[in-house]
Amino acid sequence: MGPTISVITPASRGVRELSNLLNDFKNQTFKNFEHIIVYDGPPPVDVINLMKTAGPWTQFCNIEKDYGNMDISPGTKPRNHGIKISRGQYLVFCDDDDRYKDTYLETLISNCRDNMIGIVQMSCQQSRMYKDGDPETIVLVPEIDIHMFPIICHVGTPCYIVKREWAIEEPWRHEPEHDFRFIKRICEKFKPMIQIVGGMQVDVDGLVLKGMKDWVSFPPFYRE
């Protein structure tokens, strides 16, 4: 039997960021997961050496960089490769430059069941959406009314957990692509219920650790 969760990280950064990433997932309170790190292009020697020290739940691989789609969908190829080789019932997508609370996976999986996906909060402006794609109309997510979620336009990469079977049927695309388009297609096609859980679990760019943010919840903002 495979793991409950497959965590997929499209990686392109160096040892410092990846060391933090490995440590954050080593400390997760939820243990039934695999962590697939897909390096975009040939990894440096120091990254290869670091990955040799990773825990047995970590699978490291690299793919040929997709230069033809770098401008419009730089993360599509590594994410889809991760989906293809994953074994988990659920998928979580994590960036390699963020920090993750030890309760991150436990919080995401806590309310997942048949037709439901979980959403958690991030620590900065990347956890907001743009109404109709317009950056002048900003609404913070994912603290948004549960019944309004399918109409939102932006969700940050590590905010959500989805069924693997959904991502296989509706993978990332080679077109102007972002997390909000991927998750919006999932919502439109499979019409899952959304459970917003656990408050803030993701520290974007390490702002909390740098003392620039606190682990607090944003006040709710809703789309008009």
Describe the residue ranges of each PLM region.
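Acidic donor-binding segment of Leloir-type glycosyltransferases
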Residues: 24-68
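The conserved acidic donor/metal-binding loop of glycosyltransferases
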Residues: 95-99
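Glycine-rich, basic loop-to-helix element that forms the pyrophosphate-binding segment
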Residues: 66-86
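Conserved nucleotide-sugar donor-binding catalytic segment
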Residues: 145-224
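Short, well-formed alpha-helical segments that are part of the catalytic scaffolds
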Residues: 14-27
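Cell-envelope/extracellular polymer assembly enzymes that use nucleotide-activated donors
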Residues: 3-6, 24, 34, 181
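Conserved donor NDP-sugar-binding/catalytic core segment of glycosyltransferases
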Residues: 105-136
